[in-house]
Amino acid sequence: GGYMSAMPQKPEIQNEKPNATLEALLRGYVVASIGTRGRTLKDGEKFIGKAPAAIVDLKAAVRYLKFNDKFMPGDANKIISNGTSAGGAMSALLGTSANAKEYEPYLKELGAAKADDQIYAASIYCPVTNLEHEDEAYEWMFGDLDKFERIDFSSLDAASFNDRSKKPKMITGELNATQKELSRE
């Protein structure tokens, strides 16, 4: 999440349930879990994970799978990307930017295989695509913003929540010392 570097996901049990990778394997899917560079990745003093690094890594992985299709199980023409939050945004971008020429210089520099990067489908969950709004959330979550305001859901039912003509009751507050320490990790 947060456009950070992503390690390939291992199939395992999390919170007494199979994670998405294990669930897919249990249902007979072929899974290729891809690691990507993220916004905080450095090589010495230089940031090397800034945009478009993550999407270039994903496109390179798709090209690798397609280039090697005859040597592996499954069908590389049926690749379905899956992601949540920043991963959802990456999945959406991967699904809508097939063979886009804008990425070619980056893919060439990376040494990506000579193949197309079109995928069959994208499975997208709560994609973070409005970065202007997300910047505010990151500032609060990862910065020095300690005051908050949120909707008081305790007295709302579905009808009152969906009635946009009335402003909902709000709760305002400030993080306590423990919460401040956690938000700065």
Regions found by a protein language model. Give the residues of each.
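Serine-hydrolase catalytic-loop signature spanning alpha/beta hydrolases and amidase-signature enzymes
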Residues: 2-8, 31, 64, 71
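Conserved alpha/beta-hydrolase
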Residues: 21-41
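Glycine-rich "HGGG/HGxG" loop immediately N-terminal to the catalytic nucleophile
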Residues: 38-47, 133-134
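Short, surface-exposed "cap/lid" segments of acyl-processing enzymes
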Residues: 1-23
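Primarily recognizes the serine-hydrolase "nucleophile elbow" in alpha/beta-hydrolase
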Residues: 67-145
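Surface-exposed intrinsically disordered loops and tails
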Residues: 7-14, 105, 155-164
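Non-catalytic, alpha-helical, charged scaffold/linker segments
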Residues: 125-127, 133-185
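Alpha/beta-hydrolase active-site loop
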Residues: 47-71
